[in-house]
């Protein structure tokens, strides 16, 4: 039996307010994880900044860190927490999504995936055991199982075959994680493993897979293979189908889905964990989130705008600078422009999750969601 780590504190409809205890601190859920692909948020945002803007969990990428600086180097430096000076939880993805996004550069076999590095073209092999070994070297708080992220659309026949293989890979991940956690030189002997539900947009395949993996007694469960081309309606349909078949005493993680409106819809359906590169990527291009939805600071109408990005926001950008100044920085190609907008967007997301938790605690989540969607009016 896995150690009990998740406590459901309150439900408001299907929306869940919980706590997830980890070796690196307790996570208050629902939670948005801030994505630092190479152990840093793109846009010159440091681990100290992340604490200032209310980040609970940082997410790093196994595939990219394996290529550079190399997971063995990170292990020699004491693991990711020590390497990037971050003492709160870290989740590492399995590398699966990146490997499968290489399309023409990879071959899938039962033992794993053969692919070419996107950096120098060298041949690399990654399977369940290799993914677990890399993540163990990184020493993250939560490791993700190695799975195939199925492209959309895919035939039913292919999806069934892929999901069966992903299940076999999950069994191998669990066995290897148990072995690694027992070794004397392991960075984090309490590293946790989340399994990933797959099945494309086929609800019956998704449900059967959820029923199968919930029996494996993992630390948490993710819904993967979404935000890859399906409509929002299809995505919500899959969440509605899967969530009732996952354990209520474990966190549920919707991978890679990150529009604020998507988050509200998924929380309403019982999801606890979220991540997405979207707020940082948008920020680097001057697209920032506000109470009224997303705006583009590059627009000429902000040239003389003396307001902060978002009135009342307590992020470092809004407390100190105007829209006009930040727009000027972008036009002048100053790096500070990206930094300020990334900080703002991540603060916006972290504050949104805090407000969501308060709404569930207070029993007014439905009203909160309706008000937010009305304010954003399709712009977030």
From Swiss-Prot:
PANTHER family: QUEUINE TRNA-RIBOSYLTRANSFERASE. GO terms for cellular component: cytosol. The keyword Ribosomal protein does not apply. Homodimer. Within each dimer, one monomer is responsible for RNA recognition and catalysis, while the other monomer binds to the replacement base PreQ1. The gene is tgt. Pathway: tRNA modification; tRNA-queuosine biosynthesis. Residues 256-262, 280-284 are annotated as: RNA binding. This is Queuine tRNA-ribosyltransferase. The active site is at residues 93, 275. Belongs to the queuine tRNA-ribosyltransferase family. It is an enzyme of class 2 (transferase). Its cofactor is Zn(2+). It comes from the Bacteria. The keyword Glycosyltransferase applies. Substrate binds at residues 93-97, 147, 198, 225. Catalyzes the base-exchange of a guanine (G) residue with the queuine precursor 7-aminomethyl-7-deazaguanine (PreQ1) at position 34 (anticodon wobble position) in tRNAs with GU(N) anticodons (tRNA-Asp, -Asn, -His and -Tyr). Catalysis occurs through a double-displacement mechanism. The nucleophile active site attacks the C1' of nucleotide 34 to detach the guanine base from the RNA, forming a covalent enzyme-RNA intermediate. The proton acceptor active site deprotonates the incoming PreQ1, allowing a nucleophilic attack on the C1' of the ribose to form the product. Its EC number is 2.4.2.29. Gene3D superfamilies: Queuine tRNA-ribosyltransferase-like. Binds 1 zinc ion per subunit. GO terms for molecular function: metal ion binding; tRNA-guanosine(34) queuine transglycosylase activity. It catalyses: 7-aminomethyl-7-carbaguanine + guanosine(34) in tRNA = 7-aminomethyl-7-carbaguanosine(34) in tRNA + guanine. Zn(2+) binds at residues 313, 315, 318, 344.
């Amino acid at each position: 039996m896995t150690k009990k780590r998740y406590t459901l504190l309150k439900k408001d409809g299907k929306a869940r307010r919980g706590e997830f205890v980890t070796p690196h601190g307790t996570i208050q859920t629902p939670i948005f994880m801030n994505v630092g692909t190479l152990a840093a948020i793109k846009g010159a945002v440091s681990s100290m900044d992340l604490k200032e803007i209310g980040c609970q969990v940082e997410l790093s990428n196994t595939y990219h860190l394996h290529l550079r600086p190399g997971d063995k180097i990170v292990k020699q430096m004491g693991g990711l927490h020590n390497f990037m000076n971050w003492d709160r939880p870290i989740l590492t993805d399995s590398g699966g999504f990146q490997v499968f996004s290489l399309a023409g550069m990879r071959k899938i076999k039962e033992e794993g995936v053969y692919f070419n590095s996107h950096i120098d073209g060298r041949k690399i092999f990654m399977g369940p055991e290799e993914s677990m070994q890399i993540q163990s070297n990184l020493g993250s708080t939560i490791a993700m199982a190695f799975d195939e992220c199925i492209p959309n659309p895919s035939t039913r026949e292919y999806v069934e075959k892929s999901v069966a293989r992903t299940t076999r890979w999950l069994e191998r991940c669990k066995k290897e994680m148990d072995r690694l956690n027992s070794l004397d030189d392991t960075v984090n002997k309490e590293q946790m493993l989340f399994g990933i539900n797959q099945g494309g947009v086929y609800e019956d395949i998704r449900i059967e897979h959820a029923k199968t993996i919930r029996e494996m007694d993992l630390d948490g469960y993710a819904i993967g293979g979404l935000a890859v081309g399906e409509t929002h309606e299809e995505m919500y349909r899959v969440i509605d189908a899967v969530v009732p078949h996952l354990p209520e005493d474990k966190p549920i993680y919707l991978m890679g889905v990150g529009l604020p409106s998507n988050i509200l819809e998924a929380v309403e359906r019982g999801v606890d964990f979220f991540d997405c590169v979207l707020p940082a990527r948008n920020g680097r291009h001057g697209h920032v989130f506000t109470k009224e939805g997303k705006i583009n600071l590059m627009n000429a109408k902000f040239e003389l705008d003396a307001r902060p990005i978002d009135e009342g926001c307590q992020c470092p950008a809004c407390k100190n600078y105007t829209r006009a100044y930040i727009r000027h920085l972008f036009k002048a190609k100053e790096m500070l422009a990206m930094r300020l907008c990334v900080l703002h967007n991540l603060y916006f997301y972290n504050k949104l999750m805090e407000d969501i938790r308060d709404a569930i605690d207070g029993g007014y989540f439905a009203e909160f969601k309706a008000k937010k969607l009305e304010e954003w009016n399709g712009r977030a």
